[in-house]
Every structure is written in C-alpha cells, then in structure tokens.
Amino acid sequence: MFCCLGYEWLSGGCKTWHSAWVINTLADHRHRGTDFGGSPWLLIITVFLRSYKFAISLCTSYLCVSFLKTIFPSQNGHDGSTDVQQRARRSNCRRQEGIKIVLEDIFTLWRQVETKVRAKIRKMKVTTKVNRHDKINGKRKTAKEHLRKLSMKEREHGEKERQVSEAEENGKLDMKEIHTYMEMFQRAQALRRRAEDYYRCKITPSARKPLCNRVRMAAVEHRHSSGLPYWPYLTAETLKNRMGHQPPPPTQQHSIIDNSLSLKTPSERLLYPLPPSADDNLKTPPECLLTPLPPSALPSADDNLKTPAECLLTPLPPSAPPSADDNLKTPPECVCSLPFHPQRMIISRN
C-alpha cells in the first residue's frame, strides 16, 4: 500500500494503467479494495507528512516500544499491580541510594588522587625550579636526593626521640632506686636512734653526769699539761695512762677561777720526771723550757702586736670613768699576785 502511494506521489498523482492493473490483480484476502477511498486522501497524507513529521516519528517510536514490550516478557515478571509497583519503586530508591553512595565514594577517591597528583606536580615544579637555579650556580639537585635528605632527617628525629625516651625511662629507674635507698637509709637511721636511746636510757642520770665531767676534766688537764690544743682522740689514752698518778678533778662547788688555777700544772712539777706515756714525743723537754729563744733575724709585722715581758708584771692604770665592763676586768693587784711561769713567758714571746 505504501509502495503504491509512494509510486503515485512520485508520479505526480497520475495513475497509470500499470498501477491500476497491479492493484486490481491482487487477491481479495490480500487487498480488500481501496484503503483511502480516492485521491483526496493522498493530499491529506502529503500535508500531514510535511507538517507533522516530528510528531509522527514520536508516535512511531512509542508504538514500536509498546510493541516490543508486548512481544518480550518483562524482567520483573509483574502484572502492573499497585503492590508490585510500590516494591519496584522502593527497590529503585534503594538502588538510587546505593548509586549515590558509590558516586560519593568515587568523588572522594577522585579528590584524594587529585590532591596527591597536585602535590606531586608542585614538587616537580619546585624541583625543576631548584634544579634550574642550581644549574645556573653550578649545582644539581634531584627529587630523589631531596627525598633521601628528608628521610634522613626523619630518621634522625626519630632516633633523637627514642634516645630522649630511653633517657627518661633510665632517669625514672634511677630515681626509683635512689628513693628505695633513701627509704632503707632512713629505716637504718631510725634503728640507730632507737638503739642509742635504749643504751642511753640504761645509764642512770646520777651516774651519767659525773662520768662526763671526769672525762672533760681529764681532757682539760691533758691540754694544760702538754701545751697542745684539745684533741678528743687523745683523751681516752691520756685518761688511761695518767689516771693513777693525777689528782682527782675538783668538785663543782669551787669557782671557775679556782678550777682553772688548780688544773694548771705548777712550774716546779715540770722538773720531775713523769712516768712514760703515749704522748711523750709530743711534749716539750724540761731543759728546753728554761732556755731563752734566740732573737728573730728580721723584724716582722707582728712585733707591734706582741706584749713585752716587762709589761706583763706592770699593773694597768685604772680607767677614768667607771663603766659596765669594770666587773669583767681583772684588778691590778690580782695581776701582780699571780705566780711566775716561765712557760707562759715563752709562749707570750712567741
């Protein structure tokens, strides 16, 4: 039919005897008479095709799609009911959400890759610029060398951090050990104090003070008799060697002046030989005590500070106005009444 129409349209709307003969010779079951009923339909179709070509193409595509849907069965296998459509809509929503999540992941990955690529491009640009500058100045620097230096710096930094952490751990262990030793020392000190308190409490107060006074007096007597300063480690030996032939120390009822005078050894007692003792080598021989010392070769700066021998026996003039220190000074008559000791004269000259 369309072939005939096209042929008639190409022939300018004029029928030929050949076309009429072809149409009339067709069988009735294949061609049931004229479809369009005459020539006016040809003009209508021609105008329609010229003006509504796009609409016809759309209708044709829609018909083709519907025809294909009727021929091929649907993949979902539903009959178009409301429940099936709702399930399909929900599945489509889930699928769209999954697609959206996948797209977001893809975009995130793309941004990360883009950032890395931009960093590499920037590093390459910097390296190129540095290489160009170093090439002008006679140097050369590559990206591998720069990365190697960066890795070396990172390793050095990590090594320093490791050393600092080890030093901190060692310091903590040392402080813990010192704290342990301090606790042990404090416990030992506490035990020592308890032992001292225990043995000190075993001596009664009535027996404790005379013993201390006896040792102290022996030490003072040793100092005055030997002319040496007081050394505590000589006190026990002197007390042991000289306890038999020395008089007992004075009682506490005497005054301080009487005690000091009684403890001093008289000059005539130095002439008699004493029993041998441990400190004989430290004492001055008796013949050396009476021998005058030779005069000094050169005058020294301390000559003005020494007291002459004749001034020792001269009474001091009384002070003009009485003061608060008069009671502390020695009266002139007491100075003259003191016995003469050649040993004191030798010491004063020295």
Curated annotation (Swiss-Prot):
Signal peptide: none annotated. Pfam families: NPIP. Residues 151-170 are annotated as: Disordered. Belongs to the NPIP family. PANTHER family: NUCLEAR PORE COMPLEX INTERACTING PROTEIN, NUCLEAR PORE COMPLEX-INTERACTING PROTEIN FAMILY MEMBER A1-RELATED. This is Nuclear pore complex-interacting protein family member A5. The gene is NPIPA5.
